[in-house]
Amino acid sequence: MTLPDVASGRFTQEKGFHIVLQVPETHVQIVIDAILDVAVLKQGDYDSVAFKTNTGLQQFRSLGTGRNPKSPGLINVPCLEVSFFLENEPAMITQVIEAIYDAHPYEEPVIRIQEALRTKHIPSVDEDNPNRIWNARDADWYKPDG
């Protein structure tokens, strides 16, 4: 896939990979912590940047050809999807996937890796924008120090 070249006076672009994985609800933070042990997940002036969905149901049936016995029917497990961006550094991507395999409770975790393009703001371009957190009333989720 060829990614477009996009940029403006407000943002630049960075090519890398979008990683999406499904994790049982009980193991989400364990897996995220394992990822953060090997990758900072940086986005501009922020680190530990990841997205977690609400709980959904992952379904599967074991064929009995792996470590687990054959399932008599479908199994449904409450799971979340976790997604994040990784820079185009093959060694780092390998370390992150290995960390997921080490921390994930499944024999075969569902992991999707897709070439991606992300934008990064150019600092000081719109400091006076009234929609920025620092220029508006505090959002209930944003509490600056001090």
Where are these regions (language model features)?
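Hydrophobic structural segments
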Residues: M1-G146
